[in-house]
Amino acid sequence: MLRMISLILCLLTAACYAPVNTVSDDLDTQKDLTPTDVEDDMFLNTLEGIHDVDPFSLLPVSPITWDTCSGVEGDHPCNIIAPDQREDNFGLYAEFGRPIVLDFSTGWCGPCRAAAQHAEAVQEAFSAHDVLYVTVLIETADGSVPGQADITQWAQEYDLENSLVIGGSRALLESSGGPWPLSGWPTFYYIDRNMVLRDIDRGYNANEIEHSLNWLVTL
């Protein structure tokens, strides 16, 4: 009965006060907070040092530490990013740690097509060394910039499954302001596990490709 009378008096006088033994901060500073806000704040404050953790410090260290790139032997090549024949995104730098050969080819180049006939066999022959053979198709048979359909067709025509095909354009070439030097078709760029351009071969020679890859995997 006394509790009910106290409640009625409280409501009539608008003078209800929290008991001194309640768990509360300054209510005036929290009057705009929802119960969820207060609960979240209390939870975060219980995590000692949580605000001192840099989330980027939890990420693995990137092996890509250089600021410049070029098509010069002994330097780091510039990154190439493009979808492959499966429409998966290929990134050259994402393959850090693998020996890589880039085959810059065109659809109107006879020796380029001869190289394409053996690309999958080369890929399989060096699979134990984790070599990656990537054809960068610069132009189609009619000289156009290749689209996704052209990339897929090239892969199907030459039965390329583990050997990748990506699309490029002349914008990649030094002659058009790009980083890759090219003076003949096809041109092969050999990149070691540390993403260093080690050798450049111009023209197609099956024995030369095998020789260059046998040397590359020893680095």
How would you name each of these model-derived features?
Residues 104-121, 143:
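Conserved redox-active cysteine motifs that mediate thiol-disulfide chemistry
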